[in-house]
Each structure stands twice: as structure tokens, then as C-alpha cells.
């Protein structure tokens, strides 16, 4: 497919938000859209004083989270009686801080952050109540097309990876180990380059492979500088990569608000499940004014085809266990955490039915 040219330097900048999407590390490790205001608000549908104000702090502003933006643009939150204020935190650590301090009512980030906070002894446990993405959002990009790619092809090669302990790097290393590859001995993983700059570095000739989020993966293909040969989301399995969470005290005090919020999200999920990538892209385009519709459609299609978004928001135990397997494999888990302590499916189950 012929794709529009995208400047890799520009894409490197807008990637800064997405790459922090699923890490409790500082925002410069993982991030999209520096042009997005730190605080944005729901699409302009009629609001009035009867609406309940809810502040949502998202880890990044990314096409990866399309169902959320469908819910905003189609007015589903307003329909549920919510006046939503959307804040982009640019890093899971910042999102978690906002939730713990009460600056945000709800946080949207990698669910491993709730595990870290729990292990640190948080008095008011941060509990996940809705899961949006079920795949990792990054891809392995090679210098040439490799229709018969095998993970063994990485042996002896140089790869631009991510920060140690960050979710993108942990997922990558988990896949390597699953395929019998030692991340420390069988290949060289360059962790010295900021994730927002890896696409430009790869385009400039560094390494044999690079791990990229969108829109960088599409940008490299558009410039014929790289080719997606594997999806880390597919090869790692169904991981609860990003989920909505709140303090237990907020959940207990505001069950109706959480239910309405979850209902609105479910409507966004339903729309994504019943419409084409082209239709989804048109709806969310106002959220990404700096990106042309063709590119948005290409990225939505890639995530759509790999089953990134669940049909419901129910956070299942097997996914939570896989997440802990990944953290454990990377040496980032002190001890296993009970699923029931950090997840409630009550709201998502009701919204789904």
C-alpha cells in the first residue's frame, strides 16, 4: 500500500507520549503527541450543570487507545451524564501520582503500575476496573522484508530496545526467552537511545532491528527505511497492557460514576468492534489533528488486525497472571499479588450486559 511520507524526526516527537504508556518509569523512557495539550477535555457536545465532572489522567495520547477517543468524540460520556476532563500525564508515574493525590479521579495506564504501588504498601489500594488493550502495542522492525521471519533471526544481531524494567523492554525479553533466546548473551540490545529517538536512529543506519510503537513503525515503512516483521503484541499473548484504575476509596464512594464511565467506554468498544478501521479513523481524527487521515487509518488497521482491543472491558485473571509472569521474568516482581486485591470486574461485567 502506498503510504504518505512522514518525517521521522516529527514522528519521533509524537512517539514520546505513547512509549511511556505502560511503564511506571519516567515519561522519557516510554511516550505520543507533544502537540496535545497537557489538559484536554471531552469533544464539544452540549453540557450542563447536571453533568458529573470526572477527571481522567491518561498515560499518553495515542491511536493505540482508539475506543476511548470514539467514546469521547461520539459523546458517550455526556450520554452517561459525565463531563469528562482528559489530562495527558506523559508517563505512568505521573498518572499514578495524580490518582494517589486526588488530582485525577481515574487513571489510565499500564496495570503493572498498580502492582508496584501495592508492593510499596499504598494505604488506599489502586484497583483496576476496566481493561482497554489486550496486546502490547509495539512491533519489531527490520531493514528488509522478512516473510519467513523467526525470532532466531535475532541471534547475533543488534537491536534498538528499551529501558530496563520498562514494559516494552520486558515484553520483548519475555518473547525472546519464550523462544529460547538469552537476551543478555544471544544478541545485543541497545538501551542507550531514548525511545522517542529510536526510529530516527534506525533510519540513520544504527542496528539491524528496532522495537517501535506507532506511528514510528508506519513512518519507517513509508520511507522504505524499515519493515514490520513481527508484532510483540501477538507473540507475547493477551497482556492487560493498559487499564483504568482508581483508588479503592473512590470506587467505594462513587460506584454509580464508575459504572457510567465504564458504560461509556463499553459503547466505544462496541463501536470499534462493529465498524471498519476507516470508519474508526474518521471518528477519532479530531483527536489527532497533526496526523493525516491516511496514516491514522493505517495505524488503526494494524492494531485492529492484531486484535488489540477487547470486545468488553473485563479484566480477566489469566491476563493478570501473564502480566505477573512477565514482571517476574524480568526480575521486577518482589512477590505475586492476588488478582482479587487489584482487580474488580463488577463494573465491566455490568456494562457488557
Where do the protein language model's features map onto the residues?
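Conserved C-terminal helix/tail region of periplasmic/extracytoplasmic solute-binding proteins
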Residues: 321-353
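Bacterial N-terminal signal peptides that target proteins for export
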Residues: 1-9
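C-terminal motif of bacterial Sec signal peptides marking the signal peptidase cleavage site
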Residues: 17-21
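Stable alpha-helical elements in mature extracytoplasmic
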Residues: 64-67, 73, 92-95, 110-113, ...
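Secondary-structure end/capping motifs
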Residues: 252-334
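Pocket-lining segment of extracytoplasmic ligand-binding domains
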Residues: 144, 194-288
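Bacterial signal peptide processing site
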Residues: 23-26
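Short, glycine-/small- and polar/acidic-enriched structural segments
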Residues: 33-184, 189-192, 208-214, 230-231, ...
Amino acid at each position: 500500500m502506498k503510504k504518505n511520507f512522514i518525517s521521522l524526526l516529527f514522528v519521533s516527537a509524537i512517539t514520546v507520549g505513547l512509549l511511556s504508556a505502560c511503564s511506571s518509569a519516567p515519561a522519557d523512557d516510554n511516550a505520543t503527541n507533544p502537540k496535545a495539550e497537557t489538559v484536554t477535555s471531552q469533544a464539544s457536545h452540549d453540557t450542563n450543570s447536571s453533568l458529573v465532572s470526572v477527571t481522567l489522567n491518561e498515560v499518553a495520547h495515542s491511536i493505540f487507545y482508539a475506543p476511548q477517543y470514539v467514546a469521547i468524540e461520539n459523546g458517550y460520556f455526556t450520554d452517561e451524564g459525565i463531563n469528562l476532563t482528559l489530562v495527558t500525564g506523559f508517563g505512568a508515574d505521573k498518572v499514578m501520582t495524580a490518582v494517589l493525590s486526588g488530582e485525577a479521579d481515574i487513571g489510565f495506564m499500564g496495570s503493572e503500575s498498580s502492582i508496584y504501588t501495592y508492593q510499596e504498601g499504598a494505604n488506599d489500594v489502586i484497583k483496576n476496573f476496566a481493561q482497554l488493550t489486550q496486546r502490547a502495542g509495539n512491533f519489531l522492525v527490520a531493514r528488509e522484508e522478512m516473510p519467513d521471519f523467526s525470532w532466531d533471526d535475532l541471534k547475533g544481531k543488534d537491536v534498538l530496545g528499551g529501558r530496563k524494567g520498562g514494559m516494552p523492554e520486558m515484553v520483548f525479553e519475555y518473547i525472546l526467552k519464550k523462544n529460547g533466546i538469552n537476551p543478555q548473551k544471544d544478541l545485543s540490545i541497545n538501551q542507550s537511545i531514548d525511545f522517542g529517538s529510536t526510529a530516527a536512529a534506525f533510519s540513520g543506519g544504527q542496528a539491524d532491528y528496532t522495537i517501535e510503537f506507532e506511528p514510528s513503525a508506519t513512518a519507517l515503512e513509508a520511507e522504505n527505511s524499515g519493515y514490520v516483521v513481527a508484532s510483540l503484541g501477538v507473540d507475547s499473548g493477551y497482556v492487560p497492557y493498559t487499564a483504568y484504575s482508581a483508588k479503592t476509596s473512590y470506587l467505594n464512594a462513587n460506584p454509580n460514576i464508575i459504572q457510567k464511565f465504564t458504560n461509556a467506554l463499553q459503547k466505544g468498544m462496541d463501536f470499534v468492534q462493529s465498524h471498519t478501521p476507516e470508519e474508526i479513523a474518521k471518528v477519532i481524527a479530531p483527536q489527532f489533528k497533526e496526523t493525516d487521515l491516511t496514516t491514522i487509518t493505517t495505524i488503526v488497521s494494524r492494531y485492529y488486525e492484531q486484535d488489540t482491543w477487547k470486545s468488553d472491558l473485563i479484566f480477566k485473571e489469566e491476563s493478570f497472571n501473564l502480566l505477573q509472569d512477565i514482571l517476574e521474568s524480568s526480575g521486577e516482581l518482589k512477590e505475586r499479588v492476588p488478582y482479587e486485591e487489584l482487580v474488580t470486574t463488577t463494573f465491566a461485567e455490568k456494562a457488557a450486559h
